[in-house]
């Protein structure tokens, strides 16, 4: 670079480093400088750049070409956008050559892919040839066939890109030599000339006689556009080609490429005729596509509204853009006349119709298009205009309503209170008790909190008056993690001028600036937070605390807010601003306090969730909102649901002081600060806000002080609103509180996920449908709630954006992923668009480039998308990179190419390959881990991973090699040779793993990609050790010495176990030191510093490289396998290698880490349906029971995974800082892992005293209650290695079921089979990938895949048991030297404060003096022998804890509690389980649920509590108990379990069984200090022992027993022990035949007498009616009064039966003709039989062992098992329930149904009984038709000569209806037992001449006759169990016999139910409101009715009496209203029992 006179030098960084943002001001400055008058806009930038241009701009101006053009009047100046179309349609003359190149590259990428594909298909056994040859050959043939004519829409974009790219490359290679060069070139084959430099580009078109100036960045963007378009089109073309072979091979979208190309071009043309402002119009396309998506997913109601809205927006956008343009271009040179609106609308119409056609109404296409829109380029961002937009927002007047603000504050208070109650079991301390109403004072005293459903709006107003007292501490010392986020900051006000280039600011200011700059302290000069600290030598850790306490931040003279031009969204007036370091610090602190203390009360904020958790939540939401799955609640209301996705305009700026201080004041009170949380609103209005973008300087008027400069565009004061990103968290929490008020107002349940202004809200509300359809109900709810939300926001000054607020019934659209009906629509093309921009930006670093190509294309494999598309795209670019770009690289010439050739020659020699082409194919297929021959990269890929990763890589390498050379022998030498031939360096035999101990986990799995390599680390440490700031200096020093010190401490402990060391490592200060070094080394600041200091010396590099080489050569040493055994040659090496690595990991010399073998080499994939021995089975769940939409090759499901949480004790945790909490946990972990080491206590004591200042004894009380057993287990299992093919873990969804059971022999004995999933994660992932790939390559997903281990060597390491001792001496100096990294000591005051607030601890501390209590829990329950007992009691404990949890979390995100417990239940002792369940229930009822006042009452109440439990609980429990292995085990103990067929019958069985057992002794969980974790529970339990309720206990209490882990973990552990000891053949306890049903021994005749006598009348005389008699029949019966009764009295004699009672109104045998002989009946078939009561009666009447065929329509909520039949005849052998049939084949109108009737028995079906409820006569006749068909065509039924009959239920119609041909009605039966006003009759139908069906009036006629002349009969005998069940399901507290006294006492207690102390009696359906309102009312009304009935005098059981009874009862209306219809029937059943004694 020529030395230029210092006065002129003014180098500035071009803005190209702000990728993607194109600066308007810079373009304007460049253009104005060149033409000498304003270019784009007449503003101060233009003025300055004309007056004092930058030297770089002058250079371009003075180019000869540019001068000529500017002075030539024929050339017209336009703005850059207007050249876009012309530039992007330039095809170079050698188009054919480029296309040939393209073809060649694709051809090669197909070859390379083929080499990878073959091994994959080989492993999957898919490559066996068929007619057309192998799969892989078919694929390659297919693509090569299409290659001959690559469509124009692919090749032209490639050509355009190559053209632009060549120009750029040429410029870059010139620039390397001459930094200031300006390149002038003609774009090949066009009339376009380009003058290019890094500081600006001039484009001149000789064709259209136009020219323009733009920034370098704009040019890059155009090149990237061409590239992105090529990429998108290439993938679309590939994918379409692949899909022709087999659907699912390509991507799921079916876009049409030529249309895509047309879309790009027409949009370009549209933009090129307009101006920069019109990008806003293009942005509206998104809305259009969204409206198309809604059209697909939603009903018309939802989508049309959005669609119309959107079209209006488009027109508005055009008008707005036009006005903006006219305003901007006044007086500027580049002004044009815009086309008229009509013309624009016409061209827009074309574009939109193109989009419409492209979408093809296919969601996959639309979601792809939705995201593809970045492909049209970026607008230029005008920084000044952005500031003006912000200023306008501020000046807007806001109207806030006081009521809204008050209720917002109230809701915020409510959230905090609720959070405290949930987390700390208490209210926060409050000052103003006065303002609370009595109700709230009551809540305060009981430390409880109502749920939202119980609140009203006034409650919020009441709470708004609450003030808090301080609860949280501000940390005295700054936590270093606060400091270390490397954000940008602004210079202080006095140095603000450093932002602008010198030329742009007046000389006066320049001089003054220079003077001040010299005087300023180092930290003030920097622009990044991190350096601000690094440079500060006076830095004290308590500084920040002082600033906050003294409120220095409120009037800081140096405060300025500067806006930079970096952000993309500036155009719309989003202001991203920076402030000086000091203020930034305060802001960071405020955010941190919020995050640590407050966010936990707002679970809806997304800031808390990681990606996986978020995905899990979204999956749950998708499942919940699925519209195919809508449910009704227990009151038969339809639960309407809708989703809202809202977007608020200018969310942050709309928050004024008024609207945020209502909440921030509360936070200040809680933290004891003054206005810390509203600092923003208090300081910002007083500061100047200024645009500091370098090309947009203010007009200073020579004032140095910013405050004196007049306001202007880009500089203003008195900013009122918020600022983007500064208080995000606070505002998010406010938004959540606001939604609480909305939920209360609208009375619906609302769950939301909120991130600032982006909200996804789900709303549900039970409603009565009335005449509306479900979708109308949903729509009403959506509109109503949108109105409420909109109003609520308006009240606090916010506005909802119309176009971006979507209403939907069932679509999730969060964080830009679209989900519908549970199917995920991942926009794959969007992901690879990024493959464009970096290809050149990072081209300097080929290695990084290859890595990112690999990882970005891998996105295409994600979620089971297309492997082929991914491989072909990746290989295309890799091949181009290595074979084209490397040959002449713009920065390093041929150097890299030479080294590549060197590697290829290695390979060629090593494997005798034929040519270098083949070597390149091999090289590009070697897993990227081998880093393309660069030792640096290969090291980078190894040091972050475990050796598994190594095993995997080598496996892959071998697989691929095997396909290159069939004859290659694989032995250790060849493997080593293969690895080494890829690397160029020599090896060293005596190497050790040098860096390993830095990261004991493995070779550095924790150290993410933050550090590029060790070279960088070395540099960072050396820079840091010179930093002025002491903390950074010492951390660097400590960091370098860590390794030896840690080894010193643990040298005496054996074995040296990496995971164990990790725990120790984290509890010592190194960890923090390393964290600092790590964090620093990843930041931008450090890169800047490194550049400045060039701290990396040559020796450092040599050292680091040597270290890597040594580490790598160690691999070759490890790879010396032992004795060869006879196995597949390729497996052997790897498995042995794997084993060796594993063994070595114990050897102190080389710590490597634990490993598990690679699934690819250890499993053989088998597809069969028969089960093989010893294999992992992966199978699909059956598809007909799916819940979340269909899925197949083209629709993957949403997948996810979860994490468990440790439980913490309930002390007052806010007192501790995060550091202290972590340290406590670390010490607890240490104790846990190393408990077997001799001097562990001394070590812990040392640690806790020195790091926390507490003795170990005190510290123990703060330990987490228990650590999960899994924690240790996780230590023993390796981290999961790479799967193959790489990225499919997300395929792990609900769709598959793994059974690793068959491998049990080897593994499960050691690890219960629930954990095996953890161990076998890699196998499972592998299996799932297999599934996905098979699905892609064959188009069919296999139902089952077996992974058969090739060898028995899959063995897992046990967790080590440590011996020896720690070296304590070495710990003390470490802690003393590095004290600054330790948490503060916990002071005595803090320690006391910890326990003060927690009531539980009060009692715990008092109990310390009570020695008796300490004694109580000394003894262990588990003594080594009583495994089964321990298991059974722990499982009971587990289910009770779940019961408690379900009560507490009335939330929507409930987990599936039964996961992982199936195996444990196999070994249950049922009797013991039930006894302990009963004990726990009693204890917890009393202690926690506060039921009843004394123990006797509770015991009675248990069944009631269980009856009222949410069905979800029983479903969960039934899921476990119905698993085959558990079921079989339980049947051995209790036969009656056989009758359990679904969750409701399970509930019935369980509750009944519970009543048979006594309470027993149970163990209690204690923590390390042997303190009970369920304190109240234990105390209550002791009371029970004292009162002698528990069997086998004297009053001596000293032996309450304990267990050390929580119940589930203890149970798991027992299961493991049982299996290890081979208790598989364990003798189950012999039990009596049945625990519960004594009546299973009832004789058939006894049972028959449980049915009442049936009263029927048979109609005849209707057989051949004439028309005139018909007219008479249609008239209503004369003279008969229909008895008017409101209650379903026909149920009054059915009280013996629970689930159904059809058998009480009709008898099958009575219906049959007299001549029919019972002996003809071998089998009866029942259709639509429900619970099977009629079937039971038939069996009893026919007698003998008759065979039954039972079919009932499968409906998830209804019985499809004959539960009533099984209740009374549990073990009936001859019944075919059709359990395995699908939904279709249980529907009698379907032919399939009739085909499957002879599934089990081939006897003829002489009698079929159909009791189905059939909608519509049409369907009813269809069944008759099907019956006739079957009887006349079925070969089994034709065998019999007897008559064939069908008994069928029929609802008579008003009109005469003919029976179908060949079907004759023989007899019509009308029952007294059916509904009086109904039209029900039972018909006997045979074969014969067809006749007519009875009409409604006839049936009614007969029924009334019956009702008048006959009465109901009681059954002879009673079934007390059934009766009790009926009574309890209505009123749990009541039982048989019912007496007057029982009823009156109950009535009294129900009256008291509302009083507060009994608030928690029961709960239903997780909704406390129902409980408070309905329960009380329901019980009350039913009891009143029963009381009335029991007092009645004797009467006849007929309708006259019933009518009288109803008329005399005054409260009938109340009774009917408070009870649902099904409950009403039960009420009548119970009433019937009362009548039994007093009927005549």
UniProtKB/Swiss-Prot annotation:
Gene Ontology MF annotations: ATP binding; GTPase activity; metal ion binding; mRNA 5'-cap (guanine-N7-)-methyltransferase activity; RNA-directed RNA polymerase activity
Domain spans labelled Mononegavirus-type SAM-dependent 2'-O-MTase: 1694-1884
Subcellular location: Virion; Host cytoplasm
Positions in coiled-coil regions: none
Record note on cofactor: For RNA-directed RNA polymerase activity. Mn(2+) can stimulate de novo initiation but it is inefficient at supporting elongation of de novo initiated RNA.
Alphabetical list of InterPro entries matching this protein: L_methyltransferase_rhabdo, L_poly_C, Mononeg_mRNAcap, Mononeg_RNA_pol_cat, Mononega_L_MeTrfase
Enzyme Commission identifier(s): 2.7.7.48, 3.6.1.-, 2.7.7.88, 2.1.1.375
Residue ranges annotated for the RdRp catalytic domain, each copy included: 640-822
Entry annotation: catalytic residues: 1273, 1705, 1811, 1849, 1880
Residues that bind substrate: 1728-1732
Gene Ontology annotations for the cellular component aspect, listed alphabetically: host cell cytoplasm; virion component
Cofactor section: Mg(2+)
Chain segments carrying region GDP polyribonucleotidyltransferase: 913-1395
Residues that hold Mg(2+) according to the record: 647, 757
Domain of life assignment: Viruses
Main localization, broad class: virion
Similarity remark: Belongs to the paramyxovirus L protein family.
Function: Responsible for RNA synthesis (replicase and transcriptase), cap addition, and cap methylation. Also performs the polyadenylation of subgenomic mRNAs by a stuttering mechanism at a slipery stop site present at the end of viral genes. The template is composed of the viral RNA tightly encapsidated by the nucleoprotein (N). The viral polymerase binds to the genomic RNA at two different sites in the 3' leader promoter thereby initiating either genome replication or mRNA transcription.
Assembly information from the UniProt record: Interacts with the phosphoprotein (via C-terminus); the association of P and L forms the polymerase complex.
Protein name: RNA-directed RNA polymerase L
Species of origin: Murine pneumonia virus (strain 15)
């Amino acid at each position: 670079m020529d030395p230029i006179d210092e006065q002129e030098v003014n180098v500035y960084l071009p803005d190209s480093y702000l990728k993607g943002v194109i600066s308007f001001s810079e373009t304007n400055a460049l253009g104005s400088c060149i033409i000498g008058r304003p270019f784009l806009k007449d503003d101060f930038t233009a003025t300055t750049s004309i007056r004092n241009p930058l030297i770089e701009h002058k250079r371009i101006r003075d180019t000869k070409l540019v001068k000529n053009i500017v002075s030539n009047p024929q050339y017209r100046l336009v703005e850059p956008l207007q050249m876009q179309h012309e530039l992007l349609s330039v095809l170079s003359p050698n188009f054919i050559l480029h296309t040939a190149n393209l073809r060649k590259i694709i051809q090669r990428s197909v070859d390379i892919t083929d080499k990878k594909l073959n091994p994959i298909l080989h492993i999957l056994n898919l490559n066996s040839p068929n007619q057309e040859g192998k799969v892989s050959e078919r694929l390659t043939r297919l693509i090569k066939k299409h290659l001959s004519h690559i469509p124009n829409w692919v090749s032209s974009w490639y050509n355009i890109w190559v053209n632009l790219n060549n120009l750029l490359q040429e410029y870059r290679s010139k620039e390397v030599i001459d930094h200031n060069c300006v390149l002038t070139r003609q774009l090949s084959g066009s009339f376009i000339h380009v003058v290019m430099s890094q500081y600006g580009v001039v484009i001149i078109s000789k064709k259209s006689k136009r020219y323009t100036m733009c920034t370098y960045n704009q040019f890059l963007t155009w090149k990237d556009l061409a590239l992105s378009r090529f990429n998108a089109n290439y993938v679309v073309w590939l994918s379409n080609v692949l899909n022709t072979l087999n659907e699912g091979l390509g991507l799921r979208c079916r876009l049409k490429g030529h249309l895509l190309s047309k879309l790009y071009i027409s949009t370009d043309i549209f933009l090129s005729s307009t101006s920069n402002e019109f990008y806003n119009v293009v942005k509206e396309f998104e809305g259009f596509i969204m409206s198309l998506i809604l059209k697909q997913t939603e009903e018309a109601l939802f989508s049309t509204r959005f669609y119309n809205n959107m079209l209006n927006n488009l027109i508005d956008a055009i008008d707005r853009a036009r006005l903006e343009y006219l305003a901007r271009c006044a007086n500027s040179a580049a002004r044009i006349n815009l086309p008229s609106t009509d013309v624009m609308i016409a061209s827009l119409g074309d574009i939109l119709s193109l989009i419409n056609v492209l979408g093809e109404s296919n969601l996959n296409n639309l979601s792809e298009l939705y995201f593809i829109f970045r492909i049209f380029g970026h607008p230029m961002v005008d920084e000044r205009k952005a500031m003006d937009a912000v200023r306008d927002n501020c000046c807007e007047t806001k109207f806030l309503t006081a009521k809204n603000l008050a209720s917002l504050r109230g809701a915020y208070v409510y959230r905090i209170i609720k959070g405290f109650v949930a987390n700390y079991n208490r209210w926060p301390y409050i000052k103003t008790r006065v303002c609370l109403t009595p109700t709230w004072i009551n809540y305060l005293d009981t430390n409880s909190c109502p749920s939202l459903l119980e609140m009203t709006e006034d409650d919020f107003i009441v709470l708004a008056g609450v003030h808090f007292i301080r609860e949280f501490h501000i940390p005295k010392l700054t936590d270093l993690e606060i400091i270390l986020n490397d954000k940008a900051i602004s210079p202080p006000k006095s140095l603000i001028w450093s932002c602008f280039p010198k030329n742009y600011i007046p000389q006066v200011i320049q001089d003054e600036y220079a003077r001040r700059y010299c005087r300023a302290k180092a930290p003030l000069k920097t622009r990044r937070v991190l350096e601000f600290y690094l440079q500060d030598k006076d830095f004290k850790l308590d500084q920040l605390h002082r600033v906050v306490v003294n409120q220095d931040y409120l009037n800081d003279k140096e405060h300025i807010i500067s806006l930079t031009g970096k952000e993309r969204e500036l155009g719309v007036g989003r202001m991203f601003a920076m402030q000086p370091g000091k203020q930034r610090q305060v802001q960071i602190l405020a955010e941190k306090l919020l995050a640590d203390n407050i966010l936990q009360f707002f679970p809806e904020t997304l800031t808390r969730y990681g990606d996986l958790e978020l995905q899990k939540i979204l999956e749950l939401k998708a499942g919940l909102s699925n519209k195919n799955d809508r449910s009704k609640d227990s009151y038969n209301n339809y639960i309407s649901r809708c989703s809202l996705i809202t977007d608020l305009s200018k969310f942050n700026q709309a928050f004024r002081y008024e609207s945020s201080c209502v909440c921030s004041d509360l936070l200040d009170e809680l933290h004891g600060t003054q206005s810390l949380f509203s600092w923003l609103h208090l300081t910002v209005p007083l500061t100047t806000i200024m645009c500091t973008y370098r090309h947009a300087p203010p007009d200073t008027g020579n004032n140095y002080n910013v405050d004196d400069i007049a306001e202007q565009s880009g500089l203003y004061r008195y900013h009122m609103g918020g600022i983007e990103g500064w208080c995000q968290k606070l505002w998010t929490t406010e938004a959540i509180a606001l939604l609480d008020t909305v939920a209360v107002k609208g009375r619906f349940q609302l769950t939301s996920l909120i991130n600032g202004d982006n909200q996804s809200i789900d709303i549900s509300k039970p409603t009565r449908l009335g005449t509306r359809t479900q979708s109308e109900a949903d729509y009403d709810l959506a509109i109503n709630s949108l109105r409420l939300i909109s109003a609520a926001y308006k009240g606090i000054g916010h506005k909802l954006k119309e176009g971006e607020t979507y209403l939907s019934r069932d679509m999730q659209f969060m964080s830009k992923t679209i989900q519908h009906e549970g199917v995920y629509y991942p926009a794959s093309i969007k992901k690879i668009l990024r493959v464009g921009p970096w290809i050149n930006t990072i081209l300097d670093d080929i290695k990084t480039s290859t890595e990112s190509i690999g990882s970005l294309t891998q996105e295409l494999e994600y979620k089971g998308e297309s492997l082929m598309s991914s491989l072909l795209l990746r290989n295309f670019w890799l091949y181009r990179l290595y074979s084209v770009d490397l040959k002449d690289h713009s920065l390093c010439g041929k150097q890299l190419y030479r080294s590549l050739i060197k590697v290829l020659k290695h390979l060629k020699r090593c494997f005798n390959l034929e040519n270098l082409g083949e070597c390149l194919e091999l090289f590009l297929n070697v897993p990227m881990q081998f880093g393309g021959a660069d030792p640096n990269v290969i090291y980078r890929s190894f040091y972050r991973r475990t050796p598994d990763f190594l095993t995997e890589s080598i496996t892959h390498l071998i697989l691929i090699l095997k396909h290159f050379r069939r004859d290659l022998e694989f032995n250790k030498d060849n493997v080593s040779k293969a690895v080494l031939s890829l690397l160029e360096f020599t090896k060293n035999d005596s190497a050790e793993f040098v860096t390993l101990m830095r990261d004991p986990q493995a070779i550095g799995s924790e150290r993410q990609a933050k550090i590029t390599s060790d070279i960088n680390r070395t540099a960072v440490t050396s820079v840091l050790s010179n930093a002025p700031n002491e903390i950074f200096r010492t951390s660097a020093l400590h960091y370098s010495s860590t390794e030896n010190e840690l080894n010193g401490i643990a040298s005496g402990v054996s074995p040296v176990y990496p995971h164990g060391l990790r725990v120790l490592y984290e509890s010592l200060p190194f960890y923090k030191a390393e964290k600092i070094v790590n964090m620093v080394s990843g930041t931008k600041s450090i890169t800047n510093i490194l550049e400045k200091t060039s701290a990396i010396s040559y020796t450092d590099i040599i050292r680091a490289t040597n270290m890597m080489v040594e580490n790598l050569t160690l691999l070759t040493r490890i790879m010396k396998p032992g004795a060869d055994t006879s196995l597949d040659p390729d497996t052997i090496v790897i498995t042995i290698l794997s084993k060796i690595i594993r063994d070595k990991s114990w050897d102190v010399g080389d710590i490597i880490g634990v490993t598990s073998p690679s699934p690819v080499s250890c499993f053989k994939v088998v597809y069969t349906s028969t089960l093989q021995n010893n294999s992992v089975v992966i199978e699909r769940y059956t598809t007909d029971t799916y819940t979340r939409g269909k899925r197949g090759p083209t629709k993957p499901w949403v997948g996810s995974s979860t994490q468990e949480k440790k439980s913490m004790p309930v002390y007052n945790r806010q007192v501790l800082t995060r550091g202290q909490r972590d340290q406590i946990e670390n010490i607890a972990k240490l104790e846990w892992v190393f408990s077997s080491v001799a001097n562990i206590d001394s070590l812990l004591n040392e640690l806790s005293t020195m790091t926390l200042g507490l003795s170990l004894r005190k510290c123990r009380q703060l330990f987490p209650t228990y650590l999960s057993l899994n924690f240790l287990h996780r230590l023993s299992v390796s981290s999961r290695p790479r799967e193959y093919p790489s990225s499919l873990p997300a395929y792990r969804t609900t769709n598959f079921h793994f059974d690793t059971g068959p491998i049990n022999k080897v593994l499960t004995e050691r690890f219960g089979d629930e954990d095996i999933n953890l161990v076998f994660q890699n196998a499972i992932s592998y299996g799932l990938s297999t599934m996905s790939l098979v699905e892609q390559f064959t188009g069919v997903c296999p139902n089952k895949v077996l992974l058969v281990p090739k060898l028995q060597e899959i063995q897992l390491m046990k967790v080590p048991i440590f011996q020896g001792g720690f070296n304590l001496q070495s710990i003390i100096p470490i802690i003393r030297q590095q004290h600054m990294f330790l948490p503060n000591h916990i002071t005595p005051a803090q320690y006391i404060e910890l326990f003060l607030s927690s009531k539980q601890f009060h009692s715990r501390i008092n109990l310390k003096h009570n020695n008796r209590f300490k004694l109580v829990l000394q003894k262990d329950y588990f003594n080594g022998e009583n495994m089964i007992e321990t298991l059974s009691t722990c499982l009971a404990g587990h289910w009770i804890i779940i019961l408690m949890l379900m009560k507490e979390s009335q939330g929507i995100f409930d987990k599936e509690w039964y996961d992982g417990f199936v195996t444990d239940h196999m070994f249950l002792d049922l009797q013991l389980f039930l006894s302990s369940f009963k004990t726990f229930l009693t204890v917890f009822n009393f202690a926690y649920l506060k039921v009843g006042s004394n123990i006797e009452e509770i015991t009675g109440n248990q069944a009631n509590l269980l009856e009222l439990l949410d069905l979800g609980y029983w479903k969960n429990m039934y899921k476990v108990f119905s698993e085959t292995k558990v079921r079989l085990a339980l049947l051995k103990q209790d036969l009656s379990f056989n009758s359990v067929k679904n969750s409701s019958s399970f509930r019935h069985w369980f509750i009944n069984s519970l009543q048979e057992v006594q309470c027993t002794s149970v163990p209690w969980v204690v923590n390390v200090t042997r303190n009970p974790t369920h304190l109240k529970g234990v105390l209550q339990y002791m009371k029970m022992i004292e009162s002698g309720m528990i069997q086998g206990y004297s009053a001596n209490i000293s032996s309450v027993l304990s267990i050390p882990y929580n119940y589930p973990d203890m149970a798991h552990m027992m299961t493991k022990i049982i299996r290890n000891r081979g208790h598989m053949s364990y003798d189950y306890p012999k039990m009596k035949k049945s625990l519960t049903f004594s009546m299973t021994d009832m004789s058939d005749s006894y049972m028959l007498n449980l049915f009442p006598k049936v009263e029927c009348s048979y109609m005849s005389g209707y057989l051949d009616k004439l028309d005139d008699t018909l007219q008479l029949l249609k008239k209503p019966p004369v003279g008969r009064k229909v008895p008017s009764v409101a209650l379903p009295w026909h149920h009054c004699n059915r009280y013996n039966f629970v689930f159904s009672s059809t058998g009480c109104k009709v008898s099958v045998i009575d219906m049959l003709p007299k001549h029919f002989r019972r002996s003809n009946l071998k089998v009866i078939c029942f259709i639509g039989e429900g619970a099977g009561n009629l079937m039971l009666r038939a069996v009893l009447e026919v007698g003998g062992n008759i065979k039954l065929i039972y079919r009932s329509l499968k409906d998830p909520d209804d019985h499809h098992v004959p539960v009533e039949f099984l209740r009374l005849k549990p073990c009936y052998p001859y019944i075919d329930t059709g359990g395995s049939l699908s939904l279709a084949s249980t529907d009698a109108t379907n032919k399939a149904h009739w085909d499957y009737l002879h599934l089990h028995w081939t006897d003829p079906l002489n009698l079929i009984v159909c009791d189905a409820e059939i909608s519509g006569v049409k369907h009813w006749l269809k069944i008759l038709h099907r019956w006739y068909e079957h009887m006349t065509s079925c070969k089994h039924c034709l065998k019999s000569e007897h008559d064939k009959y069908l008994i069928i239920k029929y609802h008579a119609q008003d009109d005469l209806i003919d029976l179908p041909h060949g079907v004759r009605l023989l007899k019509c039966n009308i029952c007294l037992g059916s509904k009086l006003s109904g039209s029900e009759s039972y018909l006997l139908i045979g074969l014969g001449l067809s006749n007519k069906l009875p009409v409604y009036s006839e049936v009614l006629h007969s029924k009334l006759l019956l009702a008048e002349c006959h009465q109901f009969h009681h059954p002879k005998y009673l079934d007390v169990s059934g009766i009790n069940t009926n009574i309890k399901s209505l009123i749990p507290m009541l039982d048989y016999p019912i007496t007057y006294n029982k009823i009156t006492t109950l009535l009294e207690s129900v009256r008291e139910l509302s009083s507060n102390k009994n608030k928690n009696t029961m709960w239903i359906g997780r909704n406390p409101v129902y409980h408070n309102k309905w329960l009380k009312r329901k019980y009350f009304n039913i009891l009143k009715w029963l009381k009335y009935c029991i007092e009645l005098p004797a009467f006849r059981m007929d309708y006259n009496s019933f009518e009288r009874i109803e008329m005399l009862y005054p409260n009938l209306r109340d009774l009917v209203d408070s009870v649902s219809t099904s409950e009403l029937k039960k009420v009548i059943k119970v009433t019937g029992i009362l009548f039994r004694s007093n009927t005549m």
